[in-house]
Regions:
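Acidic, Mg2+-coordinating phosphoryl-transfer loop and its flanking beta/alpha structural elements
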Residues: 174-214
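Active-site neighborhood of HAD-like aspartate-dependent phosphohydrolases
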Residues: 2-47, 53, 60-61
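Substrate-recognition element of Asp-dependent hydrolases with the DxDx(T/V) motif
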Residues: 98-128, 140-146
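Short acidic-hydrophobic, aromatic-tinged amphipathic segments that line or gate anion-handling sites
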Residues: 140, 211-219
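Conserved Lys-Pro-Asp/Glu-containing loop-to-beta segment of HAD-superfamily phosphomonoesterases
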Residues: 153-182
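Short, acidic loop-to-helix structural element flanking the phosphoryl-transfer center
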Residues: 4, 9, 84-114
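Short amphipathic alpha-helix with an adjacent loop that forms part of the alpha/beta core around
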Residues: 220-226
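Histidine/lysine/aspartate-rich catalytic loop segments that bind and position anionic ligands
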Residues: 128-159, 165
Length: 226
């Protein structure tokens, strides 16, 4: 059988790394600082969503007028907080099972990119902390779209722009940890690998019908998957 090259699209938070609640807290701090109103962001406020949509939703709940200037000031402050505080925090950690899976995918000759709700600058800070940023030639980020369902299509387009390589949706694999990740893969006709880090989310993800669903990525058989 001839080798079939796939494009694996990796999510960051909850998949490759755990931010340890640090980035969520810093984003809330940035919104609070620039609006003057105290904001708390819980797990369900951020998991599976883009940075921009998280902030928009928070501002809507506060009845704040959303302007491009306000969003820019919030994110610029957020970036500065991430640079100064995330990089030195001991709370974030890497999920070794996913890094091992990334190794397996790349060693098998497949292509990889990022598919994340993070702003590009934030994604870079998070991954450089664990020396993972250089593993990816490109990604699709929150600046590109606030609609996660659109991200696989943008990744396909970017693969051509960067590598001059074409992948059909059936030869793309979304790797994530949330219902939104599963939906983005399945509704675009991609294969979907979901690692469930929150046991209470299992049933909701399982209903989506991903190709693989488990609590630890060590058990994935790459040959069976692709």
């Amino acid at each position: 059988m001839s080798f079939r090259k796939y494009l694996f699209l990796f999510d960051i938070d909850g998949t490759l790394i755990s931010p340890g609640g640090v980035s969520r807290g810093l984003l809330a701090k940035a919104v609070t600082e620039k609006t003057g109103e105290k904001v708390h962001l819980g797990y369900n406020d951020v998991a599976g969503y883009t940075d921009r949509s998280i902030v928009r939703n928070a501002l809507l709940k506060m009845n704040q007028t959303i302007t491009a200037d306000l969003l820019d000031r919030i994110f610029q402050y957020y970036f500065s907080l991430m640079k100064s505080e995330f990089m030195v925090s001991k709370d974030p950690f890497v999920y070794q099972d996913c890094v091992d899976f990334l190794d397996k995918v790349q060693n098998a000759g497949h292509a990889v990119c990022l598919l994340t709700g993070n702003m590009k600058a934030v994604a870079r800070i998070k991954l450089e902390k664990f020396d993972l940023w250089k593993r990816f030639d490109f990604g699709v980020f929150a600046e590109d779209t606030e609609d996660k369902l659109a991200m696989p299509r943008l990744a396909k387009k970017r693969a051509w722009e960067v590598w001059k390589d074409t992948f059909t949706e059936s030869h793309m694999v979304v790797v994530g940890d949330t219902v939104q990740d599963a939906e983005a893969g399945i509704k675009n006709g991609c294969k979907t690998v979901i690692v469930c880090r929150k046991r209470e989310k299992w049933d909701d993800i399982n209903k989506m019908g991903p190709e693989w669903l488990g609590h630890c990525m060590d058990t994935i058989d790459l040959v069976d998957l692709v």
